[in-house]
Amino acid sequence: MKNKVLFFLCVCFTAFSLNAGQWIRINQLGYLPKSVKVAVFISEDSADVANFELVDAMTGKTVRDFSSVRNTGSYGTMKSTYRLNFSSFEKRGSYYLKAGEAVSPVFPINADVYNGTADFALNYMRQQRCGYNPFLRDSCHRYDGYVEYHPTKSGQRIDVRGGWHDAGDYLQYTTTSANAMYQMMLAYQENPESFGDYYDAMGNKGANGIPDIVDEIKWGLDWLDRMNPEKGEFYNQIADDRDHASFRSPVTDKVDYGYGPGTGRPVYFCSGEPQQRGKFKNATTGVASTTGKFASCFAMGARVLKPFYPEFAEKIREKAADAYQTGVEKPGVCQTASVASSYIYEEVNWVDDMELGAVELYKLTGDKKYLDAAVEYGRQEPMTPWMGADSARHYQWYPFLNVGHFQIASVAGNERLSDEFIRNMRSGISRTYEKAVGNPYLFGIPAIWCSNNLTTAMVTQCMLYRKLTGDSTYVEMEAALRDWLFGCNPWGTSMVVELPRGGDYPSQPHSAYVAEHLGNATGGLVDGPVYSSIFNSLRGIALSGLPWAEPEDYARFQPFDMVYHDAIGDYSTNEPTMDGTASMTYFLSSLQSEGMRQAGTVDRNLYYSGGIVRTDPSEKTISLVFTAHKDAEGADAVLKVLDKYGVKANFFFTGDFFENKGKIVERILKRGDYVGSHSYGHLQYIDWKHPEDTTYVTKDEFMSDIRKCYEVMGKYGITLDNARYFMPPFEEYNSTVASWADEMGLQLVNYTPGTGSSMDYTTPDLKFYRGSKEIYGNIMKEESENGLNGHILLLHLGTDKKRTDKFYDSYLDKLVKTLLSKGYRFTSLAEAVGF
């Protein structure tokens, strides 16, 4: 019977990819318990769906039948589509849906599904850094650059190193870079608790006491400061479309802009006059669209950076007013320039930039003249024009989100003003909703270039509107747009590279790093679908794949009106953008914060590759952990010490252990200690030397092994409800394995590095053998130098017979006694982790 159940579950997990004509699209990241949860059923043939099932992924049992189904008709090649609403179900766990003949991928429902996702996006921002690039551990474009279009400085050198490359190319624009900075500052301002510290200011691994998003903001503002070297002198762009020569590492970029190969790039001055656009001229009419962005970033940056970099904060504070005043004196748009083609960012609006600059100056200075000016600018463009439109030129109305309306509406003490700008925000949302209601994905975003950036903008506007008003009228569309980005779309793919790592995501983004086999564009948001008419009009598009991997053209799923391809040669739909990626940080951090509120806790754990490796470092607690597969000769000694001092511990066992060491398991459970899974078969998941490059097990093998372990654990009353923490076999894993664990509703945990306690299993014949005295000494050295707050301290319940120096016999008692005397408290992981 056991084998039949396992076979049935394996079929269920793979059926969604094998079924000939029906699929269920879901958010691959999962869902918060108290949130809108709607999947989309699609079928190539006509299908009648009146109900659907929610199935427990661990047991294969249906936990609820739903009849909350809405027929949304045909869509593209799909003759039948339905929206499947299961929002009323809130129990934590791992599930999949069944409707018709389709089975969805597995997904979790829990309060921490978005934890770490905003920080994950910063991987791409670090990868895009110009100057020193931490991803490559090398520097690029060190000689930027030479001034263009300045009345007296043209041809002179200017130091504008730093910032971020815009996308798959290496151009740099103030327009997109400033928007990226502001979006990250908004995210940090509104949700500071959602950001961690794992990297230093240069983007290298290692905490520096400053949240990583603040490090990234500072990196951007340093560059923006250089792009404004003197009062009234502002620059709009570095390099131009001559950059589009080939895929190459930025370190080896030798494009010649007329100054010699790789010896410097043009830096375009904000002249306020038309500049080159291929054979023509761009439509520049002033500088306010750019200097307004300088103003908002400098003003908000002065507030955000003051606790970390007070001198620099004061410097940009003084610059903010000058940037704004320059825009007042030279109103109009400052478009980008091109040389070889007519491709530019065709921004035509500028009052939104001045509105945001003015309101941020008001918040910085308290001077009411800035608020009055912000209101006047805001009234000139009450709604961002793309919202509700069918099309737009490339970056015609930018930024895609006008945060100025939100900031004005947030000003305390003026209800009339707040109501006016809330109405403006609602108008844009309402127009988008009107276009969305007939779509099975509730998707009303125009499929123009960078449609995913527009999607992100609308999600953010919906969330900001709901935050101001509490109005839930548009919450289902907000959820649909959120879910669109993570797989609830016609193609069933996430639009964020490697998020979730164990899911379906862009594997061939249009990036030189991918083409040159340097790595993936991790964390990057790709452009997203475009209208078929746009795609068919583009030059140089190639749907061929990489030499070592086939592309995914999704031919079977392409709607008639739009296309998306996971192919490195498709720069229109599969190129990650720096500004789009940064714009995810607000809504992702907000979702993490909402999850914390639902859980009633703040996540202060430290993570590595998706696994918790340390609990709250501000708490003087230790989670003592013992793992075991076959050896357990130390059980009596360990339990004797724990009983002697009345401390709790945590135990992770394999299926083999549960089946053969039942009396030990029962003794531990009787004590009230945490008991969790260490896998069933103690499989080796990864290549230990290259953990992220090679995974030895498939997703199905991993899940089947875990389910088998929980089936055995169930005999002891241990279920996912009371044992959701999982420690991998050999204490080795990668981000893919952690992602698979997340899908199953598990939280992967591992020991805290630094003490060497896990070496208590080593035997004298090994080169890396460590004796118990040395291990104890290393633990106490770490305690003395860095403290053990929040440590997950790993030991083994048994070791090979060749090891006669058993730590639990000789030093465990001393270790526990000493740490207790130093004021540490031994806790269960459930208490220490906090969720």
Language-model segments: what does each one mean?
Residues I213-I238:
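Carboxylate/His-rich catalytic cores and anion/metal-binding grooves
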